[in-house]
Amino acid sequence: MANFKRFIFTIACVTAGSFCSAATIQVVFDNPIFMGSGSDNVNITFTNPNAAGTLTEYVAAGRFQGTGSNLQGVQAGIFVDGLNDLFMYCYDIYQSINHGQTVDYTVNFDGELARTRSFLGAVNAVMNGNMLSGDAGYDPYAWLHPKTGYQGAAIQLGIWESKYESSSDWDLGTGSFVASALEAETTTWWNSFKGRIGSSQALDDFAVITLDNPNYQDMITADPPINVPEPGTLALVAAALAGLVGARRKKA
């Protein structure tokens, strides 16, 4: 299924040219930032971007929460739980974020890796038990809704592993991304999620967005699909946009 909001944004950009600007959102992170979900304090070791070798940091891993506002180029409906409950995970270990901080983000509809979507699909499979995607009660955004801080920590670590591990392996104990000092429950959830990679369906590209900022941690969150309208409707939209451009050119 295609995502209509991305389609119409693309059509508008192609048709209107310079009239189109990047989609943005302002996020105020909760204080504490793990409000309602909790976290696990762990050690992570990763490649040093500025020199040879690696860096090791002691960090809190878990799902972030905040409030969104000042939308430009997107509608509030693209955020699964609304702007007052904006759930997300860190997608950038080389920057930082603080409790209560305000950050202006660019909404990126193609900022995540396929490997990340594979992991999140595995998370959904575990979190939904034996339910299928069409079953009543199935949560397609279960990865955004951890029930405990240990679940959230395991999801966050898997997201980092999906992005920063240079090999195809899924092993937090070795490689270019390493995590240690996990609580036992975090390890249990990580192993459960890892065990479903490859046997569960990856998330579709349209189901995930990233929030990007060059100076602060990028975030990753969910993006609910919107059905594409009938071809006749799309043709009318394209024609209207083309007419808008033509009118502006005549005025110029």
Feature names for model-found ranges:
Residues 2-25, 217-245:
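Short, threonine-centered small-residue motifs that mark membrane-proximal processing/anchoring sites
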Residues 24-225:
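Short, surface-exposed polybasic-aromatic patches that bind anionic ligands, especially phosphate groups
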Residues 245-252:
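C-terminal membrane-anchoring or membrane-association module
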